[in-house]
Structure formats: structure tokens, C-alpha cells
């Protein structure tokens, strides 16, 4: 069985990387002889993927077509490759299936025109090959693109990761060709590298992990205010009496991108005094998801500007205060995981300019500590339910491919 897997290309985004790891690993347990062609940016990404799924799984690197913006000619040629050459080439490869992993790349949150190209490609591919959208948050779409999306997605097998998205595509796109499942990252990763805690001198449950997202514009237009609020939040945590013997782990969950978390973390860390730095562990190395999950799961709780950083914390049975900028947080964490109580709606200039965001985080921390054991128990129970949904999803995909 030969399967093309898309949207895992950058393994330094631990969210999409974890989804790719888990799909490949758990699918291969059903069909051990499967060959996975995975679109990846580099050989380094290929080696990182191989290390996380294990050596016996057959993975072939498929080079990713990159958008080139150096000049008008290269820009036009790269768009031609995406619009015409790539769909044709994929069809000619005779794959048994094409699997496009989530989360929210089929929406207008990040780019309007790119989603039109993606939708067109999906439509072309689905006429010739079985196409699966897995672990997805689809939409929102606006204007004529709603009708366009409905047309392009009509022949595709869709597996959503939350009920809110199901409500949206039922009401707004008038579609019903989907199953409601859960995010692939809720499954256990194949490996858990807890030795990373010793490397950073982190003692279990004696630290708090913070992921300040590098996607600043999703929260506020003021970089200066965004960074200064994170500095205040961290300084305040260090001063709190109840955390006097705790460290702060500043963890990058998305790296080596224009909006990589390491950029904000370095800026924040460099403003701290030498004494404050003794209490803060800066983690901006290119770790593997099995290492970042060990860090997130080993702490008391996390505060995360990356949704999959929060998911990894929850997956290990610990609470995470999630700073939301889109509906995916409400759907995946609020509705699927039933932890709306740990979400802060953090998008808006006013929150960061006035400092209200710090007050909101303080209130959530107080609430979390007051209900800590109860919340942990509920998280473990709900994660177990979501794991079963993800396993069902992978088995259903395998059955549909086999019966083609």
C-alpha cells in the first residue's frame, strides 16, 4: 500500500509533526508493509521523522515544491507548479491514497489565495485518487469561497477534530461527508524521551512551562507590547510565593520559521536580570516532539500560545492554560476536551496594551491551583475517550483504502 502524506513538511512545527508521526506509526500497525511517501522540506526533516516513528517503517522523502518570490518570473513559475504540475504528477504516481493532515491549513486564517489553490488541488486529485483530510479544522471561508470550498470538497473523505467545525461545515457549507473524531496528537507518541529533563536540570512537577507564540500578529499588532507583557508575566510568576521553589521553562514549540517561538523567547530572556535567569530555563534548541512532550508533561502545568503545546500537556495528564486566537481552541480544547475553563480569548490589541492579559492569566492560575486534582482527573478521563476516537479514525481510513 503506497500512501502520499502531505502537510508534515516542516518538522520544526511540532504540532503538524506530531500529527504526521502518529498517523504513520499507528497506520503502519494495521498495515506493516505500507510505504509512506512524505512531502518534506529537507533530508534533516526526513531523519527527524525516521527517528520519531522508528526504523522499521518504510518512509520515502518527497521533495516539497517551494514558493519562490525572488522575482516575478520565479513567482509565476512556482504558482504554475502548484496549480498544474503538482496535481498531475501526484496522479501519475498511482498512490493508493493521498492523506492531508490537519490542523487548520484549509481555512482563511493565514492566507486567502493559498487556500483557493489548495482547494483546487484537492478537487483535481479527488477525481482520480482517494483523498483523506485527517484531523482537520476546516474553514472559515468567506464570500464566494464558501461555494468554491463546498464544490472542491464534495468527493473527499473528511475527518474533523472537533464538533464546532462539524457545526460550521454543516450550516455554512451545507456538507455532510465527514466524521467527527479528534486531533491525532492526543495519541501517545511512539517514544517518550524523558532524559531531556535531566539535560535541562528540570525536576518533575517543580517547574511551569511557558510557550510564548512567535505568531505575534495573531494576538496583537504591537510586538513591543506583546513582548513586554510576557516579560511581566514571567517576572510575576518568579515573585509569587507559591512558586518560590519552581523554575520557569520557556519552551519553543515552533522553530526555524519567520514566526518561530525562539525569536520571542530570546527577546524575553535577554531582558531578565542575572538572578531572574537563574529561575528560568530557556529551551530554544531543535528538540524532537518526544522531548518537548516530556517537558510539557513533566511540569506542574503549562501556559501555551501554541495549541499543540497545550494538547501535549493535556495528553500527559497535566493542565494547560491556552491563549486562543481562533475558533480551533474552542473546538479542540473547549468542546472535544471539555476544557473551555482553561482557555483565555487572547486576541486583541486592548488586552496586550492595557495589560489585561496578565490579569486574565493570573485569574486562570488561581482557578487552576484551586481545582488542580479535580481538573487532572477529568483531563485523563477525557483524553482516554479522544484516543479511542483517533484510533477509530485511523482504522476507518485503512478500511476505506483497502476496499478501493
Regions found by a protein language model. Give the residues of each.
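Active-site anion-handling motifs in enzyme catalytic cores
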Residues: 1-404
